[in-house]
Amino acid sequence: MSVRARRIVSGRSETVAANYAFDPLHDDKIIRNRLLTRTTTTRGEPPLKKLQKKFTSFVIELDKEEDNYSECGRLAKAFLQELSAFEIPLLKSQVVVAANLREKENFNELKDETNRQIMQAQADIEDLKKQLEESKIERQQKEECEAIRKLISAQPPRSETQKVIHELKKEIAELEAENTASWRLLELRKKQFALLLHVVDELQETMEDEQKSMVEEMQRNITADGAEAMSID
């Protein structure tokens, strides 16, 4: 409901409340009290009391056993005039009561419509709350997607990535080839070193054998020389 419609409904509600100020259950009591206390002038008697006096005077005159038709007619006319004057406020009160009843019906209709609009507004508020929550979730998802998109945009193109990967694979292959060659060379060096150690061992054994032979030969020579010297003596 728009702001203008709310103002119209509010103004209409205030008007109804102002025109229908009394509960319907108290209407009869209020009207009866007004009939008993209403005055036609500022300092005059209540209409009901005046009507009662006119009626009493007319009845008293009727009860007289005299030729008083003219007086009875005058009193009857005065009573009818007073009755007519008394009836006018009654008619006005009936009009007011009818107007109040119409206003009451209008007020009830307006109340029902206002309650319906309040319920509709509450339902709309709940729907808006749900939409707001969904909008928050959607906005959060959009922000996350935007962050991912920026992160992806900051990365190099796929072609460059593939090129880098290809270069890395090539370097890895070259390193593997170098590693294989180094391993083979290391194995060769191991074998050569083992052979060298074997040769050294053989040379050492040969040298030891030669030294041993030389020592034995020297000992034999010394022994032979000693024996020869003794024989000469």
Curated annotation (Swiss-Prot):
GO terms classed as biological process: mRNA processing; mRNA transport; RNA splicing
Disulfide bond positions: none
Annotated GO CC locations: THO complex; THO complex part of transcription export complex
GO function terms (MF aspect): RNA binding
One protein family per Pfam: THOC7
Subcellular location: Nucleus
Any coiled-coil regions, as ranges: 101-221
Family affiliation: Belongs to the THOC7 family.
Subunit structure: Component of the THO complex, which is composed of THO1, THO2, THO3, THO5, THO6 and THO7.
Protein name: THO complex subunit 7A
Source organism phylogeny: Eukaryota, Viridiplantae, Streptophyta, Embryophyta, Tracheophyta
